[in-house]
């Protein structure tokens, strides 16, 4: 289904890729479950960044083995902070908005052939489009907000710029002159036109097992040759910096962040924890204790 380039709505969907990274901290659990503050993990902080930025839905690309733990810790929705303290209504609780969280995975074929975080972002955006397409192509996201568990930025700082990130067509976040275009794990947004561009760029640069060396000849194998093993399936090593190359950075609105740590490495993670700038919100935006945050299934009674 071909999705429109322009929408009358401003629906923004959050994308958090957890799969496709090669950092191994030698922990008994995945690195994004590491705490950055008391009661706040790296993935919690990323989900809150999406919520504070103004996302209507959040898609988390993860390993299948981690889904159960993620659903246990996060549930299937997070509160929209913008509606939590609405003062224009008499009963605040009745008008609160829940942002659904969807857990998806890369197919085994994708993991073998192009299993990078960059392709994970593309496939997650396509999944969001497919889900919207079941209703109508006009319900597809107008733009996508990408953040990472390695983006150690206080979610409050993202929330300060919510009006800008929602109203502007596209934005990107920077710190000290660096952004995703310089290889940092900083948030950025892209629209449907950009999605088509980055897909085309990925497929153009991604190598397969063989390459063509001459014109196609039926019944002959002289027109292709096998690539060296280290050059095969280059999409597996595609970086986020390569992903955003087709997007013209100068056409995006820049938002400067005061604080940011790239916690992809253990050394930077220790620096972020030692900063004491990260705190779990007192308001119950996230799942707390034994609270059940399971979305009601359509056509299914709660007792079933």
Predicted regions and their residues:
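N-terminal nucleotide-binding beta1-loop-alpha1 segment
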Residues: 1-34, 40, 45, 51-58, ...
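N-terminal donor/sugar-recognition subdomains of glycan-related enzymes
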Residues: 1-11, 90, 133, 142-143, ...
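Short acidic, glycine/proline-enriched helix-loop-strand junctions
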Residues: 2-14, 36-40, 67-102
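Cofactor-binding loop segments of dinucleotide-utilizing enzymes, especially the Rossmann-like FAD-
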Residues: 17-19, 63, 149
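A short acidic (Asp/Glu
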Residues: 27, 69-73, 156-159
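Short internal beta-strands
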Residues: 57-63, 173-174
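Conserved beta-loop-beta/alpha segment of the NTase-like Rossmann-fold superfamily
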Residues: 80, 87-204, 298
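Catalytic-core segments of class I nucleotidyltransferases/pyrophosphorylases
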Residues: 136-138, 153-165, 177-303
